[in-house]
Amino acid sequence: MTFAALFVSVALRWLSPLRRAKRELRAGDALHLYYDVRVLSREPSVPSLVEDAGAYSVWDKPYGLLSQGSRWGDHCTLVRWSEQHLRPSRPAFIVHRLDRAARGLMLIAHEKTSAAALSSQFQARTVIKHYAALVHGRVTCDLPKTVETPIDGRAATSLILAQRDAVDARQSVVTVAIETGRRHQVRRHLAELGNPILGDRMYGVGAEKVDLQLKAVRLEFVCPSSGKRRAYELPDDLGGTTHAGETE
């Protein structure tokens, strides 16, 4: 039987969710099993593998797929999908996140050493991350434009790089680079400028019945194995047909 989550507690101290056997159980240990058929019956959106580099893999995450799980389980997450479908199979470690409602490039590490090396690059802000967003209206300020409004009391920096016309004259597509990775940073900064992202029900027009039109289109970092700079890009296909769906 597959469980949504499995925990082990030792001497009244909670440990992390148990994914694989790491030690023998002892007298007094307690296993806590959480099973929810509604969760396990869900079919995750299918991501596309951009490259399998062995120590890490790069994916095109679709709308609706979680980056990682919660304390209750990791069904319908990119981390779990990569563990189940990559061959040869190997563990997966999260090094950054992408909103469930967004789509685009994500990087997954498969070794502890590569996870540490990649995580340190994100922490040092040396990873280049570009996003394309279909927004309401046009950004009226001169570009490039730096937005530095703090998010949840923490420093946050976004750079609006460029803008192009969308098919709908009431909309435009902007390219955004971020130096920090705060929660919903691109969404919140664009909404602050008066140009909320199409389909953003949290910071934009709540009645819109389309997916969040936000896509991670460029990811550049140093390969932890070779030490060489690697760059991955996806096409900016926003501004045409939007897709009906669900957002956070």
What are these regions (language model features)?
Residues 1-248:
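RNA pseudouridine synthases
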